Amino acid sequence: MALPDLIEIVPLDKPVRAEITVPGSKSITNRALILAALADGEVMLEGALWSEDTQIMVECLQELGFMVNVEPDANETCNRTITVYGDGGRVPPGGTEQQPMELFVGNAGTAARFLAAFVCLGKGVYRLHGVPRMHERPQAALFKALRELGYRVESPTDKLPAVIHGGGPKLGAKCQVSIEESSQFASALLLCAKQGGWEVKVVGENAEESPYVAMTSKLVEAFPHRGGKFQIEPDASSGSYFWGAGWLFQDRENYPINVAQWPGSSWQIDAQFTSYFPPPPSLSRNGQLGDSIMTAITLSPLMPNKVLFLDLGRLRVQECERVFALRTELTKCGAKVVEEGDTLTVCPSKLHGAEIETYNDHRMAMCFAVLGLKVPGIKIRNPACVKKTFPNFFQKLAAAPPNGLGAEIWEIKDGQRTRKLSGDEHFAD
């Protein structure tokens, strides 16, 4: 049974000891899937995230003609062991100008950007398209770089949908790509550069995106390009919700909430969350935190002092306009939040319950669900949007300790609690 359209999180009222496992990193999983498809042999990805975004990537690879086997993971419901049979850098041919091969990328930015570069290594014509929000998200810097390399990209708006004409490898071709809007443009090119024979120069001042480019470079260096096994580490952004939950109740004796196997590779910028939470007087998305800064923003009204969050411009062009969304929904709950340019100042506030609009954004749903563990009356609209990266998030909240937090989650109809959810009803599919 699917998650209801509107749920209420009941605050925790007793100590709990928990160690939470979180699924694999989305960022690493989708990068690894591209590299595995380009490998010369069979690559087994262990601990890979199985969510909407990664399923989209797998389905696109299968549509292209790659053999991809997906097996359950015994340790984590939303992980999989994914085996990809690479063909030495060869990408199967696409369609024709009259009938391009259609690749649907949903609202998955990594799939949209990485596949745009990837299909250039094939022959034939490919059409990438997604949901309406994905058609609003930027692509221009990537398309410009692909054209510099000699590939034909047709898109009147330089966004999706786009028709890409594959031309195979182009040895010695050069391009430069800006990361001012998104690091995914550079990552797309760097993932395919070796097999494409490309020389890629990354330009632009954007410290908040640089860690993601560094992740790509480190992953390319460490990957088993001739076949083998590769372990995906847990997703630090997903782990931030449970570290935040632990802080909410730190004043209670015997209330440790830990995240199992917290990432230690330094590949994920959000692995720094434990160093920046609770947040200092000012905190930037420019090199300090990535998406987990949303967790810090959402919980900041409960801090003893105001916090200034800086360099949030990138949040505006993701799954939703996140700066607006955070300010709007926190204000509903009674928080004092001031937006100036790409900053938010969040002041200590006495919060109350409210119905939270998630804007179909998985991180909005999860951030405010954590707030609901402390603040009575938090109701989450469209909670199933967490399927994008963490389908069993609400199962983790509701499961009995030590594997979960033991929170009650209720369906809401006509403003009233109608029934408490149980078991698989917490899963977003």
Model feature map: region roles:
Residues 1-411:
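Structural preference for solvent-exposed beta-strand-turn elements
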Residues 408-429:
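Compositional signal for N-terminal targeting/processing segments
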